[in-house]
Amino acid sequence: MRKTIITMLAFIFVSISGISYAENKVFALVPKAMNNPFFDLARDGCKVAEKEIGGIECLYTGPGEHTEQEQVQIVQDLIAKGVDGIAVASSNAAAMAKAVKGTDIPIITWDSDLLNKDAGLRAAYVGTKNYDIGVYLAQIVMMLKPNGGEICIQSGGAAAANHNERMSGIRDTIAGRADSGTYPSAALKGENGWTEASGCPLYTNDDFPLSVQQMEDIFAKHPNLTAFVPTGGFPQFVSKAFRRVTEKHADRISSMKTAVVIADTLPMQMEDLDAGRTHGQVGQQPYMMGYKAMHVLKDIVDGKALKFDNPSLKAIYTGLDVCMKPNIGSCIAG
């Protein structure tokens, strides 16, 4: 009898535990690549929100490396499994739009949005105002090199909406033209004394060793390059290799013959800025992207109205930090 009661209690406990687990809402946070330290911080914010909100699971999943088709397949699999919400940093905006079209599952984007024409397919965008990253990168370059010159922009994937917006911010600011809303905008061809180096822009596809090799090659090919401006921290994410290249060209960097201004402010990048390997960093807040993404998905499934910073774009912005050596102490690392 006693054994029977114990067995029944164990069954009830397991059943209750199963019900409790089943009631958790599963929200997927899908980065462009799991091997990118930028996205690690978004994962951390996601996990903190999971504990804070309660009753939800932050499912952090994505391609091991930057692979557009694999990311699309992962999102399609999540939809098929019936998760309760998906937040995705789109590697290929057009392909991702096709993947999420028609689903009833709440979809939001973070870090990298869908194209403007497909914005109706997602409930919100959480992240940086990407065009402004380009604006601030350009402003630093123009302050350091007011007479113009030859610039090389290094980007992520050619189909990545966020990097195309950043590239446009750089070009438009330097050229003194307004945001046309078409990304990427036209290359620089002498506006305000600036041209783009032959072979640029460079596309890394978030392959960090490749990005360092591209940097080394472009420095060798263009000894009079005025500015090297990556729209993401790509070369800095392989610290030893980046530092090897900057040490090789230490004279032209320290003398500011070539200005090196890069997006993002992860800890290793701030070390580079402090050491003089770069002249400026424009930082995002990936932790807040992951954190806010969970809160936004929870509000959506609870039927709550979202509060947008830009209602027309259904955008929730997480802020930027513009960092140079004089203000390095007040800049957020990450």
Would you name each region that the model predicts?
Residues 1-4:
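Positively charged n-region of N-terminal signal peptides that target proteins for export
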Residues 7-16:
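Bacterial N-terminal signal peptides
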